[in-house]
From Swiss-Prot:
This protein's name: Protein phosphatase 1 regulatory subunit 37 homolog
Source organism (scientific name): Caenorhabditis briggsae
Keyword Repeat: yes
InterPro entries: Leu-rich_rpt (IPR001611), LRR_dom_sf (IPR032675), PP1-Reg/Actin-Interact_Protein (IPR051279)
Composition bias, Polar residues: 41-51
LRR repeats (start-end): 232-259, 262-285, 290-314, 323-346, 351-374, 379-407, 409-430, 435-458
Composition skew (Low complexity), residue ranges: 554-563
Database matches in CDD domains: LRR_RI (cd00116)
Family note: Belongs to the PPP1R37 family.
Biased composition range(s): Acidic residues: 534-547
Length: 931
């Protein structure tokens, strides 16, 4: 090493001994041969660069064999130079990076041939030794021929797709693009997921991808899939319902959410993916600053009240999320309060874009509605709110009333199955009467009777904005025979509600028509001015300020198609492309205007407020998916012992039968759940229809929520007046007229003289009363079934029970009379009286004085008669009045007398209602007047 260093230093400084340099000859370069540079066979390279280098070395070595090379080298070796041939001689060829056919220029010149695609698909299946899918072959035959328009759907739902079949589908993906690719319930594994992700990324195959009900995809498959989705430029919707997202695969999803710039993904479904607790917190931390996702579905994940704080962080931090779906969880009142705090946060009020929220079936009560009302009054961006399937009751509607009265931005309100009765319907009617923002209200599956229907009917007369009011048709059904003549009248009220909705809808459409006509005239004028001025192809602007690039192209195509030759060409192209439903190349100005009108009219089409499950065979799917239904099978074995017509829907409580008519509503809702006892092993979770994996075991401190599998989607649906036919409450059979201690349900709204020996059958919401009079004890020989008390102790016990029953009956009579009077007030207040009824009431007012209700109660208690059921709405004086008034029927006279009893109270309530409405109108006029 030192010798080499010294030699190099000597060469650098040029220190040579003259005598030595002149006398001592330098060592000659030893002759070399090609064998010296030869490499072993296993190290030989066949590249062109290596062969060139060998050739240069051989030429240099051959020169050393010449006689001149024996001369002494008297200079430093650093003066040598090495040269290489030109670079262009080293490059023998090149190959472009592969690209999909859809990104090339030749794509617009080609046409789609379904026969050719089918041939290539079958050949690919034959090479991979797998059977082609019959459904795929049938769908290929319906492909249209336009290369610039995506096909609508490619569905393999319910088929078992292997890795070989997935690879064979590439022959389709490389030639055709789709709007939706559906791999729901196809038993995909990691290899299938990796191949599918690569094809979606490379070919940009779809806009919406459905991978739900695939439990066999694990960490490796999800990592590759999420990486491909991050690079997909057109994918907008991803459905991952009932998939196996665990702690190891969620970080890959979080990388997708944190990607900057954000991916094209705007909607993601994560129902029943164990997204609660720590997993939810990790996901929300990734979504805080995401600017792409607009819709997030987190239903059926067993969210607890403590998860409400995580939702608070999402609402207060994210600025682009528009829809948050939290259906079928156990958030509770405390969790709702956390969410309301997020809605009231200053940053969310200023920057948040959240406009729709779903809290369906979250064990929420009326106690948290005051917080929700305050949040709605402060946050003016919420347009859709669904709080159905929660036990809100009248208290919840009353607490929500301030927000509904003063709210001017809430468009859709879902109150389905919230325990609203007639009183709650009257409160809601007061809110609807003056509200000008609501477009749809859903109050189905609530025990609303005739009084609530009349209140809603009166409110809809005044309302000018609601285009769809969902209410059960059972509210007009009356079980009593004596009021059967009023059935047609109440059905007319029910139909008029639909008429009022159609009236409001027509008014909105007329306004839209006028707006579009004005806009069309303005756009035509601007086009003429632009053409006359400088022949500029500048598009007119629409109402929203967005330009319509289709206008100039469509006008040009319309002008070019005026000649006969162009018409013939267009007809030929139509015949050739008869399978093409969408033809953007042949669009005209009229079609662009129609599309523009449809886009603007979407706000008329209200969103669906019914959380109905659309998967009818969900149980079979859960049972087939391996490793996911161990507890569900146990639940099914326990449920099969029950009657086929009796389904239970409770957790930890006594199971009760579901109404058989509950499955006959218009949305085909599946209301099926199972009862799992708390004695199950700790390793098995609770199983139910609507969630998998199921909720954790119930603890003494927290009670799991009862969940009916009813799904919610705010996707646009038809605005036709939809009236469900489900019965809100099952009516109990009326007992026979016997001297039994069971209570009798009166007909509170059945006004008429009852037939002797009959009991009016009232609605199930009416209270139970006793008409019990003090009579002598029955004789011992009255019936053979009665047994005499054998001991004095039994006799004393029976007497004590009889005394308690009598006291209880007297109290129930008083409460029932008050309830009857309240029902009569509501009935008479909203009823349109005929001339005959008014005439009878005037005659009775002049002839008789109004009796005191307290005296009627006392007389009813003092009267001694056999134990016979009566209705308190039929006083004994009605018979005398009916005999004196020969011109009127007995039923009309009875109705008039009852109305006379409550006329003073009615007048007071009408005055109060009139003053309240006048005050509100004055307040609105002052508020709306210009300052």
């Amino acid at each position: 090493m030192s010798m080499k260093f010294l030699t190099g230093l000597q060469d650098l400084l040029g220190l040579y001994e003259t005598g030595t340099a002149a006398s001592s000859p330098a060592s000659p370069i030893p002759p070399t041969s090609p064998s010296m540079f030869a490499t072993p066979p296993h190290q030989q390279s066949h590249s062109s660069a290596t062969s060139v280098r060998k050739k240069v070395c051989q030429e240099a070595n051959s020169s050393a064999d010449d006689p001149d090379s024996d001369a002494r080298i008297r200079q430093c070796s650093h003066t040598r130079t090495v040269s290489f041939p030109a670079d262009i001689g080293l490059i023998t060829g090149y190959h472009d990076a592969p690209s999909a056919l859809f990104h090339s220029i030749e794509n617009s010149n080609r046409s789609i041939d379904p026969t050719e695609i089918l041939k290539y698909y079958r050949e690919a299946c034959q090479r991979r030794q797998c059977a082609p899918s019959v459904g795929v072959e049938k769908q290929i035959g319906y492909f249209h021929k336009s290369p610039d328009t995506r096909q609508e759907l490619l569905s393999l739902k319910g088929e078992r797709v292997s890795h070989a079949q997935m690879e064979a589908l590439e022959e389709i993906f490389k030639r055709v693009q789709f709007n939706t690719i559906d791999f729901e319930y196809t038993f995909l594994d990691d290899d299938c997921a990796i191949s599918l992700g690569e094809m979606i990324e490379f070919y940009d195959s779809c806009v919406r991808l459905n991978l739900s009900f695939n439990k066999q995809i694990d960490v490796r498959g999800w990592a590759a899939m999420f990486k491909s989705i991050r690079n997909a430029i057109s994918l907008q919707m991803l459905n991952l319902r009932y998939t196996n997202l665990n702690d190891r695969s969620i970080p890959s999803l979080c990388k997708l959410a944190r990607a900057q710039p954000s991916a094209s993904l705007t909607c993601i479904h994560l129902e029943n993916t164990q997204m609660s607790g720590k997993n939810l917190l990790v996901l929300i931390c990734a979504l805080k600053y995401n600017t792409g996702i607009r819709e997030l579905y987190l239903g059926d994940n067993g969210l607890q009240p403590t998860d409400g704080s995580h939702i608070y962080q999402l609402i207060s931090s994210n600025t682009c999320l528009q829809l948050l779906d939290l259906r079928n969880n156990n958030i509770g009142d405390s969790g709702v309060r956390h969410i309301c705090e997020g809605l009231r946060n200053r940053e969310s009020i200023e920057k948040s874009a959240l406009s729709a929220m779903v809290l369906w079936n979250n064990n929420v009560t009326g106690a948290s509605m005051d917080s929700l009302a305050e949040a709605l009054m402060e946050n003016t961006k919420i347009e859709t709110l669904n709080i159905g399937s929660n036990n809100l009751g009248v208290e919840g509607v009353a607490r929500l009333k301030p927000a509904l009265v003063s709210n001017s931005h809430l468009h859709r309100l879902g109150l389905q199955n919230t325990g609203i009765n007639c009183e709650g319907a009257i409160i809601l009617a007061e809110c609807i009467a003056d509200n000008t923002a609501l477009l749809r209200v859903d109050i189905r599956d609530n025990p609303i009777a005739l009084a609530g229907l009349l209140a809603l009917h009166s409110a809809m007369k005044m309302n000018t904005s609601i285009t769809l009011l969902n209410i059960d048709a059972t509210c007009v059904r009356m079980s009593s025979e004596k009021v059967r003549e009023y059935q047609d009248e109440f059905e007319r009220y029910f139909r008029e509600i639909q008429t009022y909705c159609d009236r409001n809808k027509d008014d909105v459409l007329k306004k839209l028509t006028v707006t579009f006509e004005d806009q069309d005239h303005v756009s035509e004028d601007t086009e003429k001015e632009n053409k006359d001025a400088d022949n500029d192809d500048k598009e007119p602007e629409n109402e929203d300020g967005d330009t319509t690039p289709e206008t100039s192209d469509s006008d040009a195509s319309a002008d070019q198609s005026d000649s006969p030759a162009d018409k013939e060409k267009s007809e030929k192209s139509k015949k050739e492309n008869n399978n093409n439903e969408k033809r953007p190349l042949m669009a005209s100005a009229s079609t662009s205007k129609v599309c523009q009108k449809e886009r603007h009219q979407r706000f008329v089409r209200s969103s669906s407020l019914t959380c109905a499950e659309t998967v009818h065979d969900i149980h079979d799917r859960l049972r087939e998916m391996s490793g996911s239904t161990h507890s569900l099978d146990a639940a099914m074995s326990a449920a099969t012992t029950l009657s086929p017509t009796m389904l239970t829907a409770t957790y930890g409580s006594t199971p009760g039968p579901l109404d058989a008519s509950s499955n006959t509503d218009s949305m085909k809702t599946i209301k099926k759940t199972f009862t799992v006892t708390s004695a199950a092993p700790p390793t098995l979770a609770l199983a139910e229809w609507g969630s998998l994996p199921a909720l954790p075991q119930a603890s003494p401190t927290s009670t799991p929520v009862v969940r009916k599998l009813r799904r919610f989607s705010v996707s646009p649906s038809s605005s036709v007046f939809d009236v469900a036919t489900t019965s809100s409450a099952s009516t109990s059979p009326i007992p026979e007229v016997t001297a039994s201690p069971h209570p009798i349900r009166p007909s509170t709204l059945a006004i008429g003289i009852p037939v002797t020996g009959s009991v009016p059958a009232g609605p199930s919401s009416a209270p139970m009363i006793f008409v019990d009079h003090h009579t002598e004890a029955a004789s011992p020989d009255c019936t053979n079934t009665c047994e005499e008390p054998t001991t004095s102790r039994e006799a004393e016990r029976k007497r004590a029970e009889e005394t308690i029953r009598q006291r209880r009956g007297q109290k129930e009579i008083k409460d029932t009379c008050r309830a009857v009077i309240n029902d009569l007030l509501n009935y008479v207040e909203y009823e349109e009286k005929s001339q005959v009824e008014r005439k009878a009431s005037l005659l009775l007012r002049n002839a008789f004085s109004r009796p005191n209700p307290e005296e009627l109660l006392k007389n009813l208690q003092r009267a001694e008669s056999p134990l016979t059921p009566r209705t308190p709405v039929t006083p004994s004086r009605v018979l005398e009045i009916a005999e004196e008034l020969e011109e009127e029927t007995d039923e009309q006279v009875c109705q008039s007398v009852v109305r006379c009893l409550v006329r003073d109270v009615l007048q007071t309530e009408k005055n109060e209602l009139r003053s309240t409405l006048d005050r509100r109108r004055r307040h609105n006029s002052v508020r709306n007047s210009p300052v």
